[in-house]
């Protein structure tokens, strides 16, 4: 996960989603699921997220889905509230289900809270995660399969392979998979530091006593 600024409510959302949604709820109080009037606004949400899933932080070429951060089942009053909607790929949305407050909100994640490890492409929570949120961060990794889930590792590997094969620049990789690009940049920084280190400076030498 990476930091995401709350996306401003788009024009027409109130008239085309919130108000008719609330009217529909009043007329269908026993419905299992709300009418998906938010679908026409998926593109607005995706653009606000840079087309990156709010949970796996990977470009979603399928167009993605709208996730209710607080599920419509638990909070039907928020089913048509823009502030409760997040952009997510289908797999993440399905895995999250009704976890609600247990999973970190993309809008509350801070910079550097998560990092990819190379070459495994596994994701871990860093020491930058506030102690009071650490348990939720670890739960999020496990619940959504973000740590080392087969599906997400495969998706990461696809983007990383494009970079390794020269089909994506580092900037292009950052656009599609920013956490992988950060990991590559860290590796390049370490390599450059080692290359620029003067010969014989890796360890201070103390002459033996006579």
What are these regions (language model features)?
Residues 21, 32, 57, 122, ...:
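Amphipathic alpha-helical interaction segments
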Residues 2-52, 75-80:
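Short, charged surface segments at domain edges that flank catalytic/cofactor-binding sites
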Residues 96-164:
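Conserved, surface-exposed functional patches that form binding/active-site neighborhoods
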Residues 38-65, 89-92:
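Short cysteine-rich loop/turn motifs with clustered Cys
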């Amino acid at each position: 996960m990476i930091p995401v600024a709350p996306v401003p409510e788009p024009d027409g959302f109130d008239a085309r989603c919130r108000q008719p949604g609330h009217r529909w709820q009043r007329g269908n109080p026993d419905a299992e699921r709300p009418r998906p009037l938010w679908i026409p606004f998926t593109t607005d949400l995706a653009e606000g997220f840079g087309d990156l899933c709010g949970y796996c932080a990977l470009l979603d070429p399928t167009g993605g889905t709208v996730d209710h951060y607080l599920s419509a089942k638990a909070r039907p009053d928020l089913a048509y509230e823009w502030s409760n909607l997040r952009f997510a790929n289908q797999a993440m949305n399905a895995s999250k289900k009704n976890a609600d407050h247990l999973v970190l909100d993309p809008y509350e994640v801070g910079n550097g809270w998560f990092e990819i490890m190379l070459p495994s492409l596994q994701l871990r929570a860093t020491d930058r995660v506030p102690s009071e949120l650490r348990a939720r961060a670890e739960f999020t990794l496990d619940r959504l399969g973000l740590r080392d889930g087969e599906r997400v590792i495969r998706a990461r590997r696809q983007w990383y392979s494009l970079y390794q094969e020269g089909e994506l620049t580092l900037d292009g990789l950052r656009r599609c998979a920013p956490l992988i690009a950060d990991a590559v940049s860290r590796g390049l920084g370490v390599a450059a530091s080692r290359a620029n280190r003067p010969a014989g400076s890796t360890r201070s030498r103390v002459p033996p006593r006579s």
